[in-house]
Amino acid sequence: MTVSKILKQVINRKTTRQIVIAQLGLGSLASLKQLIIEQLQLISDHRVTLKIFSQIEPNLHTFISDTELAELFSSKPNTSLSLAAIEGCQRIIVNDGKLKIDFHLGSYAQQLQQLPIVSSGFIDGWNMADNLAQEQLDSALFWQMAKLAHNDCLFCLEPTLTPEAQQQSLLLAEQVGLYSELPLKNDDTLFQERAALRAQSHQQQAPFPICPAALTPVENDIGIAIIGGGVASACLALSLAERDQRVTLFCEDDALAQAASGNKQGAIYPLLTPDNNTLSQYFQQAYLFSLQRLKTLAARGHKIDFDLCGVVHTGHDERSRKRVAKITHGHNWEPNIALAIAAEQASNIAGVKLDDGGLFYPQGGWVSPQDFTRAAFNQAQAISDASLKLNTQITGIHSKDNVWYLSSKTERFGPFKALIVANGKSITQYPQTQYLQATGFRGQVSHVPSRAKLSKLSAVLCAHGYMTPSNNDLHCLGASYVKNAADTRYSPSEQVENLHKIQHSYIGQDWIEDIDVSGHSARVDVRMVTRDHAPMMGPVPNLDAILALYQQHQLTPESRQFWQTHAAPTHKNLYVLGGLGSRGLCSGPLAAEALAAQICGEPMPISLDFVSLLNPNRMWMRKLLKGKALEMSGKS
């Protein structure tokens, strides 16, 4: 039975609109294309998520390089697919969110164990593909599959699966209650064991809680509020709109993307570390998702200035060259993510002379953050009830009966079933969010005219600062990085500093002489940065409640166990999306998609490791889980 046939059976019997089908094994390219075509033609209110669990195998590259599949995903010819053969989840969104395809690559067991449980069991059907890795099938794996499944989950085998694999799969499925030879048999004992496994997983998630909002029926929908106006909040509005949510975005400016998302050009490339740690892994998956968002919006006809011309990353002094070398050789990077290049290659790619080799990010490039922001929100308005309130500075927020109300100097808004604070440099302005651990850094980006040899620059350069190829006859370079600087006026000294960074990075190159900052053209704003450089996404921690519990369980032998097993307190139905730093174009869209999934109680496209990495309470909970002391001010 194919996934398409399973889906039809589930649609015929299910009343809820969200359907999740999971498949063990990559399956065939033809079957996946058939499913996408059927979903594009299907007139239905159902939203389908297909989760494909596959080891990283040679056939995967056939999927990644298939132009017809890429065109189906984006609805536009000559589009490349933003997928890479890396471990973890990569989400592709098709047909305005009516079909989501999650590729979970790597060990079956590891990928299943890392799935966050947002609600109870959520998988409606399991399909065993004919190219599954039979050697990975065992009882422990099938218990993981059963834990994630509804009790009435369908279990199906591809008819081309070998007889041995069929027999093994059916036997293991029967042992965990996924399959029975008797048509109406329900094994309550097995269902109880599956429920116990879910409860255990929920408890393991307790320190970094996943908190769906109490969503109301569509006919009684009071909507979701977002405070923001930049690329992250616009992408969040789009992700919520793809789930048929009613969204209101409150922006204090007279147009979208007037703050940190207002630069003329921003670079898109991942943050990599030599050991490819959790942060590095998140940035790779976020990078691919952001590229997919960008391409899809452009394919939909939204005007976005961008060029995925690649990014050349080199050192600028002995220390940074060693750092780049460590990143280059510390991990076997997938070629779609990063390639080691020599100086001659770097020069050929960049179109200007470079003396250093380094890393090349072939899918990266630059985009207009303003265009990206507007396109995301315009698309949200095109597919759902998304409204925008400009010139509306929200000065206060408060909750009553688990719904949220917002206040400006002249008006009151609400109720809203959920509220997301995503207003960049102002995320800490409310009493509920004042202790969120993110710091503002002023950044000035310089604009210089494109001329002479400088005009030949054909890739984004990243060394001590960055520089973009020209757009509308201007290059962007920068940016300055000044902590806690509230003044956002133009700085002549930072303009010169930006020039010196490029001069220092590419000493002796004649094209540097064509960089002219004397026009005093620049843009200044503040970006919020976290100590660990990870974005902040999830429920807002209730710090007063955390500190009250801390006083009761302070540094006792049992204190670590308490925090490991009790859900960390949060403000109900209040969330934050921020702390994106200087790479929000890369990290923001996936964080927004994951938050929208969490709010709506749907499968998240990130692992449990990423949930804890991004959780807004992480700085406090890391200490508590290690039995370390907190300062009672809450700012530790």
From Swiss-Prot:
Cofactor(s) in the UniProt record: FAD
GO MF: flavin adenine dinucleotide binding; oxidoreductase activity, acting on the CH-NH group of donors; tRNA (5-methylaminomethyl-2-thiouridylate)(34)-methyltransferase activity
Chain spans, region FAD-dependent cmnm(5)s(2)U34 oxidoreductase: 227-636
Enzyme Commission identifier(s): 2.1.1.61, 1.5.-.-
Keywords linked to the UniProt accession: Cytoplasm, FAD, Flavoprotein, Methyltransferase, Multifunctional enzyme, Oxidoreductase, S-adenosyl-L-methionine, Transferase, tRNA processing
Family annotation (InterPro entries): FAD-dep_OxRdtase (IPR006076), FAD/NAD-bd_sf (IPR036188), tRNA_MAMT_biosynth_bifunc_MnmC (IPR023032), tRNA_S-uridine_synth_MnmC_C (IPR017610)
Primary residence: cytoplasm
GO BP terms in the entry: methylation; tRNA wobble uridine modification
Subcellular location: Cytoplasm
Function: Catalyzes the last two steps in the biosynthesis of 5-methylaminomethyl-2-thiouridine (mnm(5)s(2)U) at the wobble position (U34) in tRNA. Catalyzes the FAD-dependent demodification of cmnm(5)s(2)U34 to nm(5)s(2)U34, followed by the transfer of a methyl group from S-adenosyl-L-methionine to nm(5)s(2)U34, to form mnm(5)s(2)U34.
NCBIfam families in the cross-refs: MnmC_Cterm (TIGR03197)
Identification of the protein by name: tRNA 5-methylaminomethyl-2-thiouridine biosynthesis bifunctional protein MnmC
Annotated organism of origin: Shewanella halifaxensis (strain HAW-EB4)
